[in-house]
Amino acid sequence: MGAVLSCCRNHSGEENEALLREQQAGYGSQGNANDEYDAEQMRLKEHEHEQKLLAREQELRDIVANTNDKLIDISMINNSGIVIQGTDLQEALDKRQQEEGGDSREDERSAGDDNLSGHSVPSSGSAQATTHQTAPRTNTFTLLTSPDSAKISKEQLKKLHSNILNEIFSQSQVNKPGPLTVPF
């Protein structure tokens, strides 16, 4: 019946009305129901696939960010030269004194301050040199000079160095949860 009405109207463009199109498609509205269901299922599958891709992409970004952070930490340590944090040096001196059973800690610190170069570099990386008396002890790094190396034996420095490197290597290991694959 829709075809008859469309012929009478001389193709006036009303063929595209919903009522006429539904009648021409078949008996009732059942003609498009399967198409709508299939289209909805395809859209849901595409949405799930997109969600999986986004989750995998985020996982890969996290892995890359963690790896980059650890590589930056390693490169900072490798490029810094021979620099020991001031508290590490003092702890090594205190430990040596306790092993030798020598004088008190205060005598060691005052003697150590007299023999140190007197310059420290703040951890923020600024190039200004300051004395031990004006710089805070918690955030300073002391350059290792020849009078300092005479106090600390080479064996202790080698142990300290190997402990630091072992800790860096243990912290820089990345355990991936599975094979890194990207579906195309």
Swiss-Prot record:
Residues 92-112 have a biased composition (Basic and acidic residues). Residues 89-147 are annotated as: Disordered. Residues 117-147 have a biased composition (Polar residues). Residues 30-71 form a coiled coil. InterPro entries: LAMTOR1/MEH1. A lipid is attached at G2 (N-myristoyl glycine). A lipid is attached at C7, C8 (S-palmitoyl cysteine). Signal peptide: none annotated. GO terms for cellular component: cytosol; fungal-type vacuole membrane; late endosome; late endosome membrane; membrane raft; Ragulator complex. The modification Phosphoserine is found at S146, S149. It is found in: Vacuole membrane. It holds the Pfam family LAMTOR. It comes from the Eukaryota. Component of the GSE complex, a GTPase complex required for intracellular sorting of GAP1 out of the endosome. Component of the EGO complex, a complex involved in the regulation of microautophagy. Present with 2740 molecules/cell in log phase SD medium. This is Protein MEH1. It comes from Saccharomyces cerevisiae (strain ATCC 204508 / S288c) (Baker's yeast). The lineage of its organism: Eukaryota, Fungi, Dikarya, Ascomycota, Saccharomycotina.
